[in-house]
Regions:
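Structural detector of well-ordered beta-strand residues that form the stable sheet scaffold
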Residues: 83-84, 111, 134, 173-175, ...
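Flexible loop residues that form catalytic
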Residues: 8, 54, 118, 138, ...
């Protein structure tokens, strides 16, 4: 079996690539930043693709990468190629709207949210949910373009002044703001086991709480990255 490895950030993938090489598994490396593909040709020289492209656009990154990756994954699946982290997974990972729907279907307790695609609809959605609310682009990472509004006056002013940015696909969520205990908690599960958990101090009006050392954020310090049980 020939395996291809689709990646974007070498530093995020080098340990996994090394693990394959150390186990004598050869990979065909594909850098999404350099990828073009012939849609008329189905002469694909690998049987399995591992997708490691980040689904979240953020500042200083070409947002078209998200959609170019999605087109490539769909095209490969139509061609019969097996993919780990395929088109459906990639899309779910990028869409806060779909993620919220999945949380609700699983009966997980999550803040009420209404999906919108017109800025003017944000006010009606917020009044239905109740203030305070936060507005998020459907697709986006690093806390980009997330804003909190405490009243209809604040939100109407932002709408009138065209200050709301719904991101690369022009859609988003109006979501009930839930007061916290001063920390953001991050928990990741691998299979049936806890992979890791962290908590980070909340900084007012900041929504970027990436826990990875490769993230370029100014709010990180040792106290923020405390592990918890």
């Amino acid at each position: 079996m020939k395996i291809a490895f689709l990646y974007e950030h070498p530093t995020w993938s080098e340990k996994l690539i090394d693990c394959f090489h150390n186990n004598d598994i050869n990979l065909q490396l594909i850098n999404i930043d350099e990828l073009t593909f012939d849609t008329d040709s189905f002469d694909i020289d690998f049987d399995l693709l591992i997708n490691r492209v980040n689904v979240m656009p953020y500042e200083k990154r070409d947002s078209a990468i998200v959609f170019h990756t999605l087109h490539f994954l769909n095209w490969l699946e139509l061609s019969g190629v097996r993919i780990i982290n395929g088109a459906r997974t990639h899309y779910i990972g990028s869409s806060k709207v779909v993620q919220n729907g999945i949380f609700s279907m699983l009966n997980l307790d999550t803040p009420r949210a209404i999906a919108i695609y017109k800025n003017k609809d944000a006010l009606k959605a917020a009044e239905k949910i109740g203030f305070p609310v936060i507005i998020k682009p459907n697709i986006g990472g690093s806390g980009s373009n997330i804003a909190r509004f405490n009243s209809s006056v604040e939100l109407k002013l932002a709408i009138d002044q065209k200050l709301i940015n719904l991101g690369v696909d022009g859609s988003g969520l109006v979501q009930k703001y839930i007061a916290s205990d001063g920390y953001v908690y991050r928990v990741e599960i691998l299979g049936d086991e806890l992979f890791y958990s962290t908590k980070q101090k909340i900084v007012e009006n900041k929504f970027n709480y990436c826990a990875t050392k490769g993230c370029n954020i100014n709010t990180r310090n040792t106290e923020q990255d405390e592990e918890f049980d």
